Amino acid sequence: MIIVYRLTQELREKLKKPLGILIRGSFSETIKKFSDIMEKEKSPRIISVGDTVSKILVTNNIFPQLSIVDNKVMRKSIKPIALGADETVMVGNPAGTITEEALTAIQKALESNSRVKIVVDGEEDLLTLIAVLHAPENSFVVYGQP
């Protein structure tokens, strides 16, 4: 496994602050606000990072083109979520890193017209950065903020 990036303590502190628009509220409030933003912006693609966010979107008939999950919520294992993806890709990505395997899988998924679910053995949090970096312009990258 080739580690391309490793999280430093300095960057860990910076990443505690949300990137982009923070939508606060209950699940129902945030999904309503997000739906309103989607309707207004007419984004070409939605990318979800995290099991809870991905499940909430799909439960509300919002289907991400790419979902990145690790089958964990708050570091506790959960039953895998059915996201209706056309393709599922498994990658390794230890906590606090970004691996070449994960980076390449995200790039390929975003080049595809299929709905892709990337299941991470390790941790998916930092992969949000790769999704933002490689997403088509005006895409929505949606992730949970503890």
Q: Could you say what each language-model-derived stretch is?
A:
Residues 2:
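Active-site helix-to-loop segments that bind/position phosphate- or nucleotide-bearing substrates
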Residues 5, 9-146:
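Conserved mixed alpha/beta catalytic, RNA-binding, or beta-rich assembly cores of soluble enzyme
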